[in-house]
Curated annotation (Swiss-Prot):
PROSITE patterns: AAA. Residues 209-219 have a biased composition (Basic and acidic residues). Belongs to the AAA ATPase family. It comes from the Eukaryota. Residues 120-137, 364-380, 497-523 have a biased composition (Polar residues). Residues 468-478 have a biased composition (Basic residues). This is Protein SAP1. GO terms for molecular function: ATP binding; ATP hydrolysis activity. SMART domains: AAA. One of its GO terms (cellular component) is cytoplasm.
C-alpha cells in the first residue's frame, strides 16, 4: 500500500483504515503455514517416515482448528469479510479437511507397517546389473547421500588431481572418463557445487551408481570398464559436475536435435508421479531391464566411438593433459560409457557447441531434448522408450522444473548458489541469460496464497490463464484448463500427493502437450525473481502447488455461477457491439457498464392512486411491447412520453413500474451519462445509446430531469457541446418512428421503422419538474405528455393505509379521514416523510428511557403523532407552482389527471 510509505498528516487515519485488513493478514499467514507443513508431512510419507508424519498430521489438524477458531473469535463479523478473506477462509478449511484425510490414511499405513523401500540411489543395488562400472568397496563419506544435507561437490577429494582439475581448465579432460572434449571445453564450463538429490524411486532403481560416478574413475585403472559392466551405460547422472560431464556427452554424442526439441514438452504431473510408484511397477521395471540388456550391447559400440580415444579429439586431449601426473593419467579409463542428458539437461554453450567440429559425423547440431521420437538412432530411441523419458526434461523450449530431486546447473555464473533459469529463445546463446518472462512456480505457500487471492481475477478473464510464450511451461493440475493430451484430468488435484497414480509405459512419448497449449500459471507467479530461489528447489513446492491449486479450484467452482454470468455477459456485450455498425466500441462499453439497469421490481400495486396515469402508460408502453403484432401502421406506439408535474408525485416510480411490467431493458440516463470532456465523445455516447437500445429491444430509455439535457436551445448561455448533444439526441430519436404514417413497410430514409418490430420497440420516457424549459423540438417528439398531479383525497387515504399497514397504530377510519383533510396540498413524498416523522413520536416520548424499554412496551402510533409532525413537515409545492403546472398541462398536456 502506497500510503504506508508516505508520511503525511493522515498517516494515523491510514493506519486506522487498515485495521479491517487484519483478518486478511491472519488468514494469509495461516494458509501459508498450513500449506508448507502439509507439503513437509507429505514429504515424510514419501520417505516412509510414517510415524513422524502421523505426529505431524495430528499436530497440524489440532493447531489449524485452534487457530481458525481463534481468528473467528477475534473477528466474529463474518459478513464484513471481503471476497479475498472468504476465499482464504475456504482454502484453509479445504486444507484442514485434506489434513484430516491424510491423518486417517497415515494411521492406516502405520498399522499396516509396509516394508520400507529405500529411496536412496546410492544404497539401492541390483542383483544382476545396474551400472557400467563397479563401486569402490569403501566409498568416501562425502558420497553418503542424506536428504537435506548440503554438499559442496560429489567428487572424491582424495582422488589425484582433484584441485588441479578445477583450477586448471586444461586438466579437465581426465575428470570424467565419458566426456568427449574435456580439454577444449573446460574453459567454457563452470563447476556447479549445488547438491544433487535423487530423482525418484524409478530413477534410483534404473541408475544405481551415478552418484559415485566420479569416485571410481579416479581410483580405478583403465580396466575398470570390463566386459561385465561395459554393456550397460549410465543413462542419468545425478552428480553435480554435469556442466563438465554431460555437456561433453551431449556435445560428443549429439543424441538430440535442438530444432526438433521444441516439440518436446514435459508433463510435470507425470514427472512427480514417480515418487509414489507401487511395487507392481518395480516388477515391470525388472522385466524392462532384462529386455534392455539385449539392446545395450549394440549401443555400446556406437558410444565407444565417441569416447576420448577418438582420433579427431585425441590430440587435444593429450596436449591438455601433459601436466597431469603419471599416476593420474594411468587412472583414466579408455572406453567410458556415454551418459545421456540428465533431467533437465544442462545448458549448452555456443562456444561449446561450435568447438566440436571433430564430432560432426555424429552431430545433430546442438541437442538438448530427449524425446525418443526425435532421435535419429533407432537403438537409442528404443532404449529411451524403455527408460521412461519423462525423467528427462525439455530444453530451451521449456524453463526449469522446480523439484527437490532435480539438480541445478549454472553456466558462466559467478555464484554457484543461484539456480539455472532456462531461456525460451531459439539461439544457443540465450541459454546463458536469465529472461524475465520465464514463468516460475511460487517458492513458498505465501505465493500460493496470493494465487488464491487472485483466483477470481484469473477465472473471470480466461486470457490471463495463458502465457506470453508459445511454449507451455508446466502442465497445469487445476480444473480450470482442460488438457486433452495429458492423462492428468481435472480430478487430479483431489488426489493426495503421496498417492499419485503411476503412469503407464510409453505415456511419455504419446502424451506430450501441444506446443501452443495454455497453462493456468497466474501472472503473479511469473514475476518472481530468480534470485529468490537459492540452492536446490524444494520438492515441497510441488505439494504447495497441489494444495493451493486444489483449494483454488474448489473456490472457483463455488463462484462459478457468478463468474459464468459475468463472462457470459461480457461475451454477449462483445457480440452486440460487434454487430453494431458505426458505433464507437468504447462508447458502447460505457453504455453497458454505467447505464444499463435491470428493471427494479416495482409493480402497479406499489403506487397508490394515479389510475389515469397508469392507464395511459399501459396503453402507450406495456401493451405495444407485449403485443407488437397488434400495434402496426396507425396503431404504431408512441416513441416518446413525458411525465411532468410537481416534485414528489411518483414520476420515477411510474417509470420503474413500466420497466417491470413491460419486461423491457431499462436505460437510466442522466446528464453525466452522455457528457464527456473529449470533443465529439458525447455524440458517440448518444449514438451508442440508441443503437444498443434498438438491439436490446424492447427497451425504455428513461431520462430523469430531462430539462438538464434537452433544455431550450434559445438560451444565450448555451455552449456548443451541449447543442451538439441535443441535436444528436433528436436525430437518433427521430429514427425510432416511421416517416410515413400508416405504412407497414420500412422507409428508405429511416434505418429503423415498423418493418422490424424488434428494432422499433424503444420508448424514450422522460420526467421533469420544469416542462416549460424543454426545447420545442423535444416537446414535439413527446407525443404523450402526462401530467402527474398532487395526490387526490382518495389517493392520500390509500397511501396512509399502505404506510401504516405494517406498524402498530390506533388510527381509525375517522382518523384517516381527518388525516386526509389536514394534508391537503401534500405530495406523495411529503406524505411519506410525514408518516416517518410520526412513527418517531412514541420513541421521542420515552426520552432517555428508550435504551432500557422493551420493544413490546413502546406505545403504538396515534393521530396525535401525525398532528405533532405537521408542525415540522410542510408541503413542498406552493400554490403558485401548482397553478403554473396546471396552466402548462392545459396548454401542452395530452391528457388530464
Amino acid at each position: 500500500m502506497d500510503s504506508q510509505r508516505s508520511h503525511h498528516i493522515l498517516t494515523r487515519l491510514t493506519k486506522i483504515r487498515r485495521r479491517p485488513q487484519q483478518p486478511l493478514t491472519d488468514f494469509t499467514e495461516l494458509y501459508s503455514r498450513i500449506a508448507n507443513e502439509t507439503i513437509y508431512y507429505l514429504n515424510l510419507e514419501e520417505k516412509k517416515r510414517y510415524k513422524e508424519a502421523l505426529q505431524g498430521w495430528k499436530a497440524l489438524t489440532t493447531d489449524v482448528l485452534f487457530k481458525q477458531t481463534l481468528i473467528e473469535h477475534n473477528y466474529p463479523n463474518t459478513q464484513s469479510y471481503t471476497k479475498d478473506e472468504v476465499s482464504l477462509q475456504n482454502g484453509i478449511r479445504e486444507l484442514y479437511h485434506k489434513s484430516v484425510m491424510h491423518l486417517k490414511r497415515v494411521k492406516k499405513l502405520v498399522r499396516e507397517e509396509p516394508a520400507p523401500r529405500n529411496d536412496m540411489p546410492s544404497s539401492k543395488t541390483y542383483t544382476n546389473h545396474s551400472s557400467s562400472f563397479t563401486r569402490s568397496t569403501e566409498p568416501p563419506p562425502v558420497f553418503q547421500m542424506v536428504p537435506g544435507r548440503m554438499m559442496k561437490t560429489l567428487r572424491n577429494r582424495n582422488a589425484c588431481g582433484y584441485k588441479t582439475a578445477y583450477s586448471n581448465p586444461s586438466l579437465s579432460s581426465y575428470g570424467n572418463s565419458t566426456s568427449i572434449k574435456r580439454g577444449e571445453d573446460a574453459e567454457n564450463i563452470r563447476v556447479n557445487f549445488v547438491p544433487s538429490k535423487p530423482l525418484s524411486n524409478n530413477a534410483s532403481r534404473q541408475h544405481k551408481n551415478p552418484i559415485e560416478h566420479n569416485d571410481p574413475p579416479l581410483k580405478k585403472e583403465t580396466e575398470l570398464y570390463s566386459d561385465k559392466y561395459i554393456s550397460e551405460p549410465i543413462l542419468i547422472d545425478l552428480t553435480n559436475d554435469e556442466d563438465d560431464h554431460d555437456v561433453g556427452i551431449l556435445k560428443g554424442h549429439n543424441v538430440f536435435d535442438e530444432e526438433e526439441s521444441d516439440g518436446f514438452e514435459f508433463d510435470v504431473s507425470d514427472y512427480y508421479d514417480n515418487f509414489s510408484e507401487v511395487d507392481v511397477e518395480e516388477e515391470e521395471e525388472e522385466k524392462e531391464e532384462r529386455r534392455r540388456i539385449k539392446t545395450l550391447e549394440a549401443i555400446q559400440q556406437q558410444m565407444s566411438d565417441l569416447s576420448v580415444t577418438s582420433s579427431t579429439s585425441s590430440n587435444k586431449s593429450v596436449s591438455s593433459s601433459e601436466n597431469v601426473p603419471g599416476s593420474c593419467i594411468q587412472s583414466l579409463p579408455t572406453t567410458a560409457p556415454a551418459l545421456p542428458s540428465l533431467p533437465p539437461p544442462p545448458l549448452l554453450n555456443v562456444d561449446r557447441a561450435s568447438s566440436t567440429g571433430a564430432l560432426k559425423p555424429h552431430s545433430l547440431e546442438t541437442s538438448t531434448t530427449m524425446d525418443s521420437s526425435k532421435i535419429r538412432n533407432p537403438q537409442i530411441s528404443k532404449l529411451m522408450k524403455n527408460n521412461h523419458v519423462p525423467y528427462l526434461k525439455g530444453t530451451k523450449s521449456t524453463p526449469t522444473l522446480i523439484t527437490k530431486s532435480t539438480p541445478t546447473f549454472i553456466t558462466r555464473s559467478k555464484s554457484n548458489t543461484k539456480p539455472i533459469i532456462k531461456s525460451n529463445a531459439s539461439s544457443p546463446t540465450s541459454s546463458l541469460t536469465v529472461p524475465n518472462s520465464v514463468i516460475q512456480k511460487p517458492k513458498t505457500a505465501a505465493m500460493a496464497a496470493k494465487r488464491v487471492l487472485n483466483s477470481k481475477k484469473v477465472a473471470s478473464n480466461p486470457a490471463l490463464n495463458t502465457t506470453k510464450k508459445s511454449h507451455p511451461i508446466l502442465k497445469s493440475k487445476t480444473a480450470k484448463v482442460p488438457n486433452s493430451s495429458s492423462k492428468k484430468t481435472s480430478s487430479h488435484p483431489s488426489r493426495p500427493v503421496s498417492n499419485s497414480k503411476p503412469y503407464s509405459h510409453g505415456a511419455s512419448q504419446n502424451k506430450k502437450p501441444s506446443k501452443n497449449q495454455t497453462t493456468s500459471m497466474s501472472k503473479t507467479n511469473r514475476k518472481i525473481p530468480a534470485q529468490k530461489k537459492i540452492g536446490s528447489p524444494k520438492i515441497e513446492d510441488v505439494g504447495t502447488e497441489d494444495a493451493t491449486e486444489h483449494a483454488t479450484s474448489l473456490n472457483e467452482q463455488r463462484e462459478e455461477p457468478e463468474i459464468d454470468k459475468k463472462v457470459l455477459r461480457e461475451i454477449l456485450e462483445d457480440e452486440i457491439i460487434d454487430s453494431l455498425q458505426g458505433v464507437d466500441r468504447q462508447a458502447a462499453k460505457q453504455i453497458f457498464a454505467e447505464i444499463v439497469v435491470h428493471g427494479d421490481e416495482v409493480h402497479w400495486d406499489d403506487i397508490a392512486g394515479l389510475e389515469s396515469a397508469k392507464y395511459s402508460l399501459k396503453e402507450a408502453v406495456v401493451y405495444p411491447f407485449l403485443r407488437p403484432d397488434l400495434f402496426r401502421g396507425l396503431r404504431e406506439p408512441v416513441r416518446g412520453m413525458l411525465l411532468f408535474g410537481p416534485p414528489g408525485t411518483g414520476k420515477t416510480m411510474l417509470a420503474r413500474a413500466v420497466a417491470t411490467e413491460s419486461h423491457s431493458t431499462f436505460f437510466s440516463i442522466s446528464a453525466s451519462s452522455l457528457t464527456s470532456k473529449y470533443l465529439g465523445e458525447s455524440e458517440k455516447l448518444v449514438r451508442a445509446l440508441f443503437a444498443i437500445a434498438k438491439k436490446l429491444s424492447p427497451s425504455i430509455i428513461f431520462v430523469d430531469e430531462i430539462d438538464s439535457i434537452m433544455g431550450s436551445r434559445n438560451n444565450e448561455n448555451e455552449n456548443e457541446s451541449s447543442r451538439r448533444i441535443k441535436n444528436e439526441f433528436l436525430v437518433q430519436w427521430s429514427s425510432l418512428s416511421s416517416a410515413a404514417a400508416g405504412s407497414n413497410k420500412s422507409n428508405t430514409n429511416n434505418s429503423d421503422t415498423n418493418g422490424d418490430e424488434d428494432d422499433t420497440r424503444v420508448l424514450v420516457l422522460a420526467a421533469t419538474n420544469l416542462p416549460w424549459s424543454i426545447d420545442e423540438a423535444a416537446r414535439r417528439r413527446f407525443v404523450r405528455r402526462q401530467y402527474i398531479p398532487l395526490p387526490e383525497d382518495q389517493t392520500r387515504h390509500v397511501q396512509f393505509k399502505k404506510l401504516l399497514s405494517h406498524q402498530k397504530h390506533t388510527l381509525t377510519e375517522s382518523d384517516f379521514d381527518e388525516l386526509v383533510k389536514i394534508t391537503e396540498g401534500y405530495s406523495g413524498s411529503d406524505i411519506t416523510s410525514l408518516a416517518k416523522d410520526a412513527a418517531m413520536g412514541p420513541l421521542r416520548d420515552l426520552g432517555d428511557k428508550l435504551l432500557e424499554t422493551e420493544r413490546e412496551m413502546i406505545r403504538p402510533i396515534g393521530l396525535v403523532d401525525f398532528k405533532n409532525s405537521l408542525v415540522y413537515i410542510k408541503p413542498s409545492v406552493s400554490q403558485d407552482g401548482l397553478v403554473k403546472y396546471e396552466k402548462w398541462a392545459s396548454q401542452f398536456g395530452s391528457s388530464g389527471s
